[in-house]
Amino acid sequence: MTALKKIEKAAPLPVSTNFGIEGMTCASCVRRVEKAITAVPGVASANVNLATERATVQFDGEPDTLAVLHAIEKAGYAPRIATEELQIEGMTCASCVSRVEKALKAVPGVADAAVNLATEKATVSLISGTADLSALEAAVRGAGYELRKTKPAEASAGDEDHRAAELGSLKSAVTISVLMTLPLFLMEMGSHFISGVHELIMGTIGMRNNLYLQFALATLVLFGPGLRFFRKGVPNLLRWTPDMNSLVVLGTTAAWGYSVVATFVPRVLPSGTANVYYEAAAVIVTLVLLGRYLESRAKGRTSQAIKRLVGLQPKTAFVLRGGEFVEAQISEVVAGDVIRIRPGEKIPVDGTVIDGSSYVDEAMITGEPLPVQKTADSAVVGGTINKTGSITFKATKVGSDTLLAQIIKLVETAQGSKLPIQALVDRVTGWFVPAVILAAVLTFAAWYTFGPSPALSFALVNAVAVLIIACPCAMGLATPTSIMVGTGRAAELGILFRKGEALQRLRDADVVALDKTGTLTKGRPELTDLVAAEGFEADEVLFLVASLETLSEHPIAEAIVSAAKSKGIATAAVNGFEATPGFGVSGSVSGRQVLVGADRALATNGIDVSGFSTEAELLGASGKSPLYAAIEGRLAAIVAVSDPVKETTPQAIRSLHELGLKVAMITGDNRRTAEAIARKLGIDEVVAEVLPEGKVEAIRKLRQGGRSVAFIGDGINDAPALAEADVGIAVGTGTDIAIESADVVLMSGDLNGVAKAIALSKATILNIKQNLFWAFAYNVSLIPVAAGVLYPVTGILLSPIFAAAAMAMSSVFVLGNALRLKSVNPA
């Protein structure tokens, strides 16, 4: 059974939808949301990412987005919904309303749509970040109506607005909390730092009023700025699904509640234990809020690559309307529009130049440092910058179909994916928070039973320290933040990871297998030799061969036809043309049967090519690809073409060797030619004379011995090989990045991108391991310290205040370490 037939018989691929989620703070939240979503009927899988605050949900059939939204809400979190109000033109009756609603609801990412005939408006609820106006407009037009946007999104303007609002809210909360906590801290602990503070308080307001004031300040902190912890933590406790917020609530409430008892009814406590810990409760809230604020700022920096990509597209374009160019919103541009670009302006959408000449800076898209010349019929890409001249072009792709939109989607998909290395984290986070609560209970019991006097005070302080120091956030952020920054940095270098897991697999590669034509070489062969056999004229042979090759799409055919044109040789019509991949082409030209191909093609037809064995050996030794031509069943000529090696290829091979990788070349060329090229470039292994369908078997052979193989090809002809390899890398694809079989796409044809991708993969996985080590080592080592295991030997106990500071900084450390990937510059 062929691969195509297997695909045809396979089940349809699940539909994927992304959901923005508010309220997640730690890895336990991630696990809870995933569990809630996967319980929805029709959901195949759910992948929740704490760093991006998004869930990628795969559906088996028709997506039931409303059910997923309800599941997220039921789990205690808020799905991020944006509301668009749209003006619908052309509706006349209730049937129109039904038709428009149905069309809008069918758009991926639309949670609900309500259309009002009287006002001629539609209110559309969008899952934030998954659908844009152009998709809604296309749906409405497809139903036979016209649409125009009347006002911007109201409920949520998108991820950036959400992050900015959250950051502002946290900043205000931290400021208020600090202003109230500082005097509270000085009243209770000031005498440890400033002599005379205690006497001053006693001589002015007195001890009783001091306690009342501490109670008031601590209460304001807990139920003012700290109320966010209660709103999320308490419901999760009641659902028996505690999270990070629940730990903060338990710890601070225990300290505050004990202090309230000690303040107002101290007689119910054992003698000598009526101590207050108001400052501990307030400082814990303040430090955790500060940690959240710093974490939110760092999270914003991890997504800067996406922000930069989104910022590449201009808001308006000068479009030809009614015989003159007028400024129009980018959302109003449609395929077929004629657009004018002046020097220094950004190109708004993808298109083809119809007039003018200029140089365009495509570095932000392809990573190519030098501007590219654009003339008539040249393709231009939205988001690139016109440098010198003025050009006019016709729009070919707009909205979500543009290359820039596809790149953004690929990067977002990669950033939201999980790596195999995260499996351990997922297993641990399921029981981590309940285990911490159990540890706190055991700590309290142990100190209350066996601790020194006052045992109740010791038990309370140490139990609170255990609750506060535990940090599932660091574990939840360890992997996704590194993936976000790593894939974002890769995008800046023109490297697109279509699948996040390719980051890990690429790092494990042992062998890099390269297709020759178009990958190692420029893919533009040139005719270098044509030696006619006795009884044939060279120009006559070239005429017949070039005529036949006009119907072939192979690069070698283009070289032969181009050579004939340069000599002024006109081609003739061809009858009975046949092409056999990996062998050659045949047909009738001017009444004569012509066959052109490799030696195996002629041998199959019973034609002996040994008469040109000497020439073939010399041509092959010099790296040229020999072909043979037969006319009327007789050997007529040997033809040689040479495909120049890319200037960047030798350095790329050296870079791969420096990374400790074996380099192999897979080609359909004869062995002599292939080995000559391999020697010149320093390639370790050669798999020659491979038919297109034989590349898959070649990769399987290279994989023998347990080796992991990364295959680099053009992404189109090499699709089966790209899919077979452990990691498939499509190189030099230009504007075509929608290659399902490739795990990684290199925007430019520079093979150095392969070494950069591998180096970045290694750096990212190392960064993830550092984060995971820190997250696990932090919790494994400091939770016992907070419980007081060092006290019997050293007399050291960990204050809940220091526990809060350590917990707040642990997530910031993980994020800061991930951000180091932004400066990675692989050679």
From Swiss-Prot:
Mg(2+) binds at residues 714, 718. Cu cation 2 binds at residues 93, 96. The active site is at residue 515. Its main location: membrane. Keywords: ATP-binding, Cell membrane, Copper, Copper transport, Ion transport, Magnesium, Membrane, Metal-binding, Nucleotide-binding, Phosphoprotein, Plasmid, Repeat, Translocase, Transmembrane, Transmembrane helix, Transport. GO terms for molecular function: ATP binding; ATP hydrolysis activity; copper ion binding; P-type divalent copper transporter activity. Involved in copper transport. This is Copper-transporting ATPase 2. It comes from Rhizobium meliloti (strain 1021) (Ensifer meliloti). The gene is actP2.
